[in-house]
Amino acid sequence: MKFSESWIREWVNPPIDHDQLIDQFTLAGLNVEESRKLNSNKFYGIVIAKIIECQVHPSLADTWIMTVNSGGGNIINIITNNMNYNKNTKVVVANIGAILPNGNIIKQINIQGRKSEGVLCTFSMLGLNYYTQKGIIELPIDAPIGCNFYDYLHFNDNIIDINITPNRGDCLSVIGLSREIAAINQCKLKKINIKSNVPNILDTIPIIIETPHDCPKFLGKVLKNIDITIPTPLKIQEKLIRCGIQPINIITDIANYVLLELGQPVRIFDYEKIDKNIIYVRFSKPGETLTLSENNINIKLFSKTLVISDVRKPLAIAGVITGNQSSVSCSTHNIFLKVAFFNPLTIINQYKLYNLYTSSVVRYEKGIDPDISELALNYATSLLIKYCHGKAGPTINIISHNHLPKIKIIKLHRSKLNMILGFYIPDQKIINILTNLGFQVETQGHNWIVSTPSWRFDINIEENVISEIIRIYGYNHIPKIPAKISLNQTVQCIPNQVISLSKSKTVLIARGYQEIITYSFVDPNIQKLLHPQCIPLTLMNPISTNMSVMRLSLWTGLIQTMLYNQNRQHKNIKLFESGICFIPKNSHSKQVSQQLRLSGIRSGLRHYEHWDIHTSLTDFYDIKGDVESILYLFNKKNQNNNIHFKSCTYPALHPGQSAEIYLNDIFLGYVGVIHPMIQYKLRIHSNVLVFELIWDSIVNIKSQKIIDISKFPKNYRDISLIIPTHISASSVIETCKKIGIINLTEVKLIDVYTGRNIPTNFKSLTIKLTLQSKTHTLKEQEIKEIIIICTTTLKKHFNAIFR
């Protein structure tokens, strides 16, 4: 929601500066994404004036002398060749001494014996090139004479952009944001001054609502003899531009103006294009189409699309977009104004169906205040009558009260409030906070009965009310109370799960990784590429379409973060994340199991570039080593805890460079290279490697205990053997470990060879045995016996040939 500070201060103007205003928004839970000064050109001495007299210059053809009143009794003559304006027209004048944006200073000049004591200003002269109107600036008749034009349009303004969360649709308007500031500063909001809209014509339109569940409230009004050619007042244009909306015409601009100020979408139809002058709110019929007004694309309507129609054709997709069959044109004189309340779920389904996310959808999907409809209709009517003249008919009001949102009544307990907050707020302070937020409060002993405002759909339970109280009271005002502890207090042990995860993070950080935190809501398209076999939990009301499902693994967030960095020329990436993943229990229900997982991702070079170090691209064995370094924390050698990897096929991973991870035959997760097809679709430019560990499976394994280091020397022996290529080196190592020889402390692979002198489909492995006793120095005979046991076992299991 982008808006100007000056517009907020028209509604509520507390004695705080800009920085304090930003802080108040932030502390109230409204995330300010950007705050900047209005990018306007500076000019000085430019004022509003009134033309008193126009006369032809006696000595020059096509030249006139304008006598204007520029305020303070200052009557001056200005010579101009532009004669498009009449007596009493309000204009913008640069007096003598005025400074224009280009640095020019206005001076008195003589033209054929007549003095010119200023200049009538155009938009381009003042650097306001975003206005398309040509000629001298003309202002409304109520513009104050002598007022500084820079101040009149509030050019000394700030633009604020706030990221509105899905639960705070009430803040998608100037009035909604002003309510927050008024509540924090205990100020009163201004009231909209609407002149009485007494009907002066009797024209109405019958409105038939066939689906009151989807549209429980519909208001309308007929306006006739509207002049659409009148330019939109500059103040309205400036407000729209500062909110990121380009002015179009007076009708559309006023509709957008009311939308931004009150948060209620207003639709305006050409009255003459409504067939038989009857409005229906119904579902679409087979074969119906709608031509969109923005790009003249003709779309076929899906069944069960809620439309606004006349007797013959659809006029609009309800709450989403209007068709050009009924849109206002330059020849329009009679219009029909419509405001409505639609069921948010209906609008969400419709915009997803047609992929049309309009400014109206933004409001309707989050829920608009059903009680503001009539105010918005009357406000739009009064503005149109004020600027476009014309006559208005009576309000047409169709309401199904049974289908409108109900006011929620919640009991707030003083005991629960104190328990959650941890400190005491006086009763009157609580009542004032809730009343200023629009709640109705009734005291009941030590408790309160609270009725929610019509615009707050997010307040459902007692905890919601408590969060509102502390939000406005101010988190920064929570008293600092020293913690009270007892020396006899029982120390609570930290769960092994937390300790082991913390240790594992330390290991990864030591290996050059950086920790990230991402949302549990992820992009469904990326997740489907990684896990096509699973159906994720879908959010009913997502923040956005690319955050609409719950994550099945941490890879989605890691890959998106990696892509973000890759697109900013960061090539060497090592990231990890821990968090909850939501795994469906079966494909037939929405039940999920929540699993704590630890995942990592890396790409780029194995080592940072250095003139003295030869480096290469990271590969499968690098990330496999990272996983092993974590699992070594749990590898208790004397209890036969064995880490091993099994080749596997997983949709997200390269079929030849992926493996399942096991510890003590317990499945822990996957490691490997992202599948080449996925890398291509996501435009990943280098090999990306990932791992994921199911932490809930790891924590049940006891961590390695500290043991005494033997003071006796180690002995090393190498065994070279030839085995078939399909036998993995890890199975050879595990077989040696499982023999159970006490003095065999370590077995590791040191060489793999294929080629000359090795039969086809065979390979040569060399493994190194580390032998050490805790009680004595091993004798050569003892060592030979261990070697014989190992070679005999390997020959028996794998039919190995020793070199």
From Swiss-Prot:
Residues 710-803 form the FDX-ACB domain. Its main location: cytoplasm. Its cofactor is Mg(2+). Mg(2+) binds at residues 458, 468. Keywords: Aminoacyl-tRNA synthetase, ATP-binding, Cytoplasm, Ligase, Magnesium, Metal-binding, Nucleotide-binding, Protein biosynthesis, RNA-binding, tRNA-binding. InterPro entries: aa-tRNA-synth_II/BPL/LPL (IPR045864), B3/B4_tRNA-bd (IPR005146), DNA-bd_dom_put_sf (IPR009061), Fdx_antiC-bd (IPR005121), Fdx_antiC-bd_sf (IPR036690), NA-bd_OB-fold (IPR012340), Phe-tRNA-ligase_IIc_bsu (IPR045060), Phe-tRNA-ligase_IIc_bsu_bact (IPR004532). Residues 405-480 form the B5 domain. Binds 2 magnesium ions per tetramer. It is an enzyme of class 6 (ligase). Gene3D superfamilies: 3.30.56.10, Bira Bifunctional Protein, Domain 2 (3.30.930.10), Ferrodoxin-fold anticodon-binding domain (3.30.70.380), Nucleic acid-binding proteins (2.40.50.140), Phenylalanyl-trna Synthetase, Chain B, domain 3 (3.50.40.10). Its EC number is 6.1.1.20. GO terms for biological process: phenylalanyl-tRNA aminoacylation. Pfam families: B3_4 (PF03483), B5 (PF03484), FDX-ACB (PF03147), tRNA_bind (PF01588), tRNA_synthFbeta (PF17759). GO terms for cellular component: phenylalanine-tRNA ligase complex. The keyword Magnesium applies. Residues 40-150 form the tRNA-binding domain. PROSITE patterns: B5, FDX_ACB, TRBD. It catalyses: tRNA(Phe) + L-phenylalanine + ATP = L-phenylalanyl-tRNA(Phe) + AMP + diphosphate + H(+). It is found in: Cytoplasm. GO terms for molecular function: ATP binding; magnesium ion binding; phenylalanine-tRNA ligase activity; tRNA binding. Belongs to the phenylalanyl-tRNA synthetase beta subunit family. Type 1 subfamily. Tetramer of two alpha and two beta subunits. This is Phenylalanine--tRNA ligase beta subunit. It comes from Blochmanniella floridana.
